Curated annotation (Swiss-Prot):
A UniProt-annotated Pfam family: PROPPIN
Gene3D superfamilies documented for this protein: YVTN repeat-like/Quinoprotein amine dehydrogenase
Keywords: Autophagy, Endosome, Membrane, Protein transport, Repeat, Transport, Vacuole, WD repeat
Residues passing through the membrane, by range: none
UniProt entry tagged with the keyword Plastid: no
Protein name: Autophagy-related protein 18
Domain of life: Eukaryota
Organism annotation: Penicillium rubens (strain ATCC 28089 / DSM 1075 / NRRL 1951 / Wisconsin 54-1255) (Penicillium chrysogenum)
Length: 427
């Protein structure tokens, strides 16, 4: 039996695990198995809050909605291509294919809309759990220019596909209309997440160094955080239920917890709160925002070009900022170009967690690459829950007043020691 997929439900009270021989559902507080089905090779599973309704992908193109309490199938749908992801709330069911999104009324299972997208092989899509702010977010479809030509390296007869955009389209899933486009990153998107109220959007690009948070639906940038200086694949992002913290896991095997400041944003719409600065496993970076290639302005993205200007404008800004209070820096930022003023932004984690590496049992594979993970915050306690691709469920305590490194308090296994995650964590 191999693990195929793992995800938390919308309020993080349950954990669902899809395997090659059925699926399992666990409560998270306390951790205990709640339900198990031992039939079917389940590629993807999604729950609807704490109800008995689950959505299952049984074969690449076949979706089944089941009632686990009655142990019956409610409906079954077949799609033209592989189903990559499923999203649910109390009003809508979203099915993500590589180049289409199907939107259903979850009460009647009536197809409401079919949305064409740019190729989206990583199923980058988020649906707010909220019924009031029932927003869906996905990469803005790219339109190839009329004069676009296929690169020389492309095989004859193939259609060239441009990289995924760094812009996010906000779609009202009740009114069935696009309402905004958020210019999130210059690089292609890697992951997006909406909070429980549908009022905040977190975004990460494929570089994985900068995490941004925008208000929804108006798209104002509220916060910008730095995960690290070295590129990394972002695996999971999750707000806590009160939207005061954001957890982020990546291929560095460090989970970062970012604190959303209670005070107002700075003059350019970004957070002016500065949590303790930490950069785990990455060289120190004193240049902040402009150091990252993804966010560079002109040639300022190059570390060497910044060092050349040390002692001039860049050096003066760095030395001055060490002696200037946050309020003064915010006022000065209003007179500087955006790329320069954003160097004062905090962009560091408030707390962090280092994931342990477990010893694989018989048939385990230590060479399976980075330890992938899905993260969530407990609704009742200051704890971070992490499920890893080697089948472990961890609970860490964090200090909400001081931050710092989290402490491992509980550890469980969601599968046998020989099982590993072979398909994907929820992206």
């Amino acid at each position: 039996m191999a693990m195929n997929f793992v995800t938390f439900n919308q309020d993080y009270s349950y954990l669902a695990v899809a395997t090659s021989k059925g699926f399992q559902i666990f409560t998270t507080e306390p951790f205990a198995k709640s339900y198990e089905a031992k039939e079917g090779n389940i590629a993807v599973i999604e729950m609807l809050f704490s109800t008995s309704l689950v959505a299952l992908i049984l074969s690449p193109r076949r979706l089944q909605i089941q009632n686990t309490k009655r142990q019956c199938t409610i409906c079954e749908l077949t799609f033209p291509t592989t189903v990559l992801a499923v999203k649910l709330n109390r009003k809508r069911l979203v099915i993500v294919l590589e180049d289409q999104i199907y939107l259903y009324d979850i009460q009647t299972m009536k197809l409401l809309s079919t949305i064409d997208t740019s190729p989206n092989p990583n199923a980058i899509c988020a649906l707010a759990p909220s019924s009031e702010n029932c927003y869906m977010a996905y990469p803005l479809p790219q339109k190839a220019p009329a004069a676009a030509s296929t690169p020389a390296h492309a095989p004859p007869g193939t259609t060239h596909v441009s990289p995924t955009t760094g812009d996010v389209l906000i779609f009202d899933a009740v009114k069935l209309e696009a309402i905004n486009v958020i210019e999130a990153h210059r690089s292609p998107l890697a992951l997006i997440a909406l909070n429980s109220d549908g009022t905040l959007l977190a975004t990460a690009s494929d570089k994985g160094t900068i995490i941004r948070i925008f208000s929804v639906p108006d798209g104002h940038k509220l916060y910008q955080f730095r995960r690290g200086s070295m590129p990394s694949r972002i695996y999971s992002m999750s707000f806590n239920t009160t939207s005061t913290l954001l957890c982020v896991s990546s291929s560095t095997e460090t989970v970062h917890i970012f604190k959303l400041a209670q005070q107002g944003p700075s003059s350019d719409g970004s957070s002016s709160h500065s949590p303790p600065s930490r950069d785990h496993g990455s060289p120190p970076n004193t240049y902040g925002y402009a150091h990252e290639e993804d966010e560079a302005v002109g040639d300022a993205g190059s570390d060497s070009s910044l060092r050349k200007h040390n002692g001039t404008l860049m050096g003066m800004i760095r030395r001055t900022s060490q002696n200037v209070g946050g309020a003064v820096a915010a006022r000065m930022g209003g007179y500087l170009p955006k790329g320069v003023s954003e160097m004062w932004e905090p962009a560091r984690d408030f707390a962090w967690i280092k994931l342990p590496r477990s010893n694989p049992g018989p048939g385990g594979n230590t060479g399976a690459g980075p330890l992938r993970s899905v993260v969530a915050m407990s609704s009742n306690t200051p704890q971070v829950m992490v499920v890893t691709s080697d089948g472990n469920f961890y609970v860490f305590n964090i200090d909400l007043s001081k931050g710092g490194e989290g402490t491992l308090t509980k550890q469980y296994s969601v599968v046998d020691s020989t099982d590993r995650l072979g398909y994907t964590t929820e992206y």
